Amino acid sequence: MGATGLLFTNAVTDISPLAKLTKLVDLNIHTQDISDLTPLSGLTSLIELRLAANSFADLSPLRGLSTLEYLELTGNDITDITPLSGLTNLMQLDLRFNPDLTTIQALFENPGIGAGDIVELRHTNVSCADQARLAEKGVEVRTELFSSCATATRQR
């Protein structure tokens, strides 16, 4: 059957060897120094992808990963999530600790984002208006415990 999941917690900087693992369904590349996601672009079987605490900003290699249901992008250098607009199977998106993220327009353009989905926005600079707009789609928007945004679900 081969490998279907990998867990990384090492000092990884180059993920190009992963490009050949096209049947992976779960990948965790947490707390590394990954700056280029291009090798992931062909991993079209991925359902869960965790990329927390790296150093990338460009999400365009994820554009074609249409089977993704869970995507964790916590603690990176993300300012633009436009490539996520076509990931219609996403059910949970974690964007925490991306303080330069100010717009989530791509989520409004994504027809798959809606009732029952979860979007984590703690420690971003997404406006209350955008958070409310997302909540109006039936999305559970998670934000700071003491957020001034009325529609957000507070997390501890």
Model-derived segments and spans:
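Concave beta-strand-loop units of leucine-rich repeat
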Residues: 1-35, 39-57, 61, 66-79, ...
